[in-house]
Amino acid sequence: AMAEALAWGSLLAENHTVRLSGQDCQRGTFSQRHAVLHDFNDGSLYTPLEKLNHGTTAFRIYNSSLSEASVLGFEYGYALESPDALVMWEAQFGDFANGAQVIVDQFIAAAEAKWHQKNRIVLLLPHGYEGAGSEHSSARMERYLQLCADDNMQVINPTTPAQYFHALRRQVHQNVHKPLICLLYTSDAADELDGVD
């Protein structure tokens, strides 16, 4: 979570909008993020990274409904119209991306080949919770790898905070506009922040 916050904050400081939506993404399904703090006494919300908002850039984080296809479709369109922003959609559990498979198949994996549309959207898919029960343990990495063709998208599995930090920053700074599918072992991605500079 620290590497993620550092990546977001550094992009905001460089005048890039950062946007994330998904079920329970403000807190993080596994209580790893805490991007939005809730005051227990009065119910008010505090989002520390909003302090870095200036000019036309903004940090926006939205808890969305369990309507994966519609939310991912909206975020895909937002990313298409905001090519300099870091736009992310997080599945509460990686399996929940099943509900958005049509968006992945028709747009994320194929829009560049079909319509010459380039997009930098990031899919954050928690992965690897063996024993967590059906529909809660696998982001189906093989499904995304099977969709890879002609450099249409990037599929990564960062194993250190530094790798995740650099992947998010690279998504905004690289000249190539490709969707990024990021399979995250949230509970195991804890380490020193070496390499985050």
Say what each PLM segment does.
Residues A1-D84, W89-E112:
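Non-catalytic terminal/interface segments that mediate subunit docking, oligomerization
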Residues A79, A149, D191:
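Residue-level marker of positions within ordered structural domains that often coincide
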Residues E90, L193-D194:
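Short intrinsically disordered, low-complexity segments
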Residues A91-F93, G99-Q101, D105-E112, Q117-L184:
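Phosphate/diphosphate-binding loops
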Residues Y185-E192:
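Conserved small/polar residues in nucleotide/adenosyl-binding loops
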